């Protein structure tokens, strides 16, 4: 029996805090190019729920997968790792 109730957790940087109760978090990952072998950086942006509007631009935060809060929000900020 595996524990499937573990939610995904990602670490990224807040790149936008303009929306109410929402921050945009950029997740960077390194991948090897399939043909040339060079290590390149790929990034994805996720909208995450921030109930108290406490996370600011540039903060490094951990986000966790949750039930959908809106059309584009299915992640929630868990904690701050580094304050800008």
UniProtKB/Swiss-Prot annotation:
Transmembrane segments: none annotated. Gene3D superfamilies: Nucleic acid-binding proteins (2.40.50.140). The keyword Cell division does not apply. Keywords: Ribonucleoprotein, Ribosomal protein, RNA-binding, rRNA-binding. It comes from the Bacteria. Pfam families: Ribosomal_S17. One of its GO terms (cellular component) is cytosolic small ribosomal subunit. GO terms for biological process: translation. One of its GO terms (molecular function) is structural constituent of ribosome. One of the primary rRNA binding proteins, it binds specifically to the 5'-end of 16S ribosomal RNA. Part of the 30S ribosomal subunit. NCBIfam families: PRK05610.1, uS17_bact. Belongs to the universal ribosomal protein uS17 family. HAMAP family: Ribosomal_uS17_B. This is Small ribosomal subunit protein uS17.
């Amino acid at each position: 029996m595996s524990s499937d109730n573990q939610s995904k957790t990602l670490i990224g940087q807040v790149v936008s805090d303009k929306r109410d109760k929402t921050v945009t978090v950029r997740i960077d990952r390194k991948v090897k190019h399939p043909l040339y072998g060079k290590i390149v950086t790929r990034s994805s942006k996720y909208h995450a729920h921030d109930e108290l509007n406490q996370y600011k631009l540039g903060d490094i935060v951990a986000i966790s997968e949750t039930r959908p809060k809106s059309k584009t929000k299915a992640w929630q900020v868990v904690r701050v790792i580094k304050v800008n």
